[in-house]
Amino acid sequence: MIKQKKLSVLFVCLGNICRSPTAHAVFRKCVSDNGLSDIINIDSAGTGDWHIGRPPDRRSSEKAKEFGYDLSDLRARLVETSDFENFSYILVMDSKNLDDVRKLAPKDHKAKIELLLNYSARSRVDNIYEVPDPYFGGEDGFDHVLNLIEDATLGFLDYLKANYISELE
């Protein structure tokens, strides 16, 4: 019998080619390293339709690879109405994404929609609450984004482990 995944997480940014696929890959590795891949389903999506079907931005993929994360199997897609029923958590990168996702959400949805950096200890210290879009910037922006995402996804996994995982195993 195949064990059904009991928690699901969708990471969302604007185009689904930089921030959300990075979060997807980083969190997927954290989940795998903790032996929780059979419990947690992970995906990513965007609120804009410019890049549907395309792989992540080369700079995101290269930066992620430097740190041991693999984005090669990911392809951009749009947030869909069904995501609000299929995902327990929808974690967005910035306040514009948060507004856009909330506007798309059906009134009776069950998903918890919030900023990814709500789970980052570092962001509270540095007063950073959004993952900035590195698309139009230089290489340093991709480093910064990866560091923010690593901290927040580890914090989110700690939150899940403390509040849900023991009940689901």
Predicted regions and their residues:
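Conserved active-site segments centered on acidic
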Residues: 1-86, 159-169
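Hydrophobic structural packing positions in well-ordered secondary structure
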Residues: 13, 64, 91-92, 149
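Helix N-cap/beta->alpha junction signal
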Residues: 20, 94-95
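Phosphate-binding/catalytic loops
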Residues: 89, 95-169
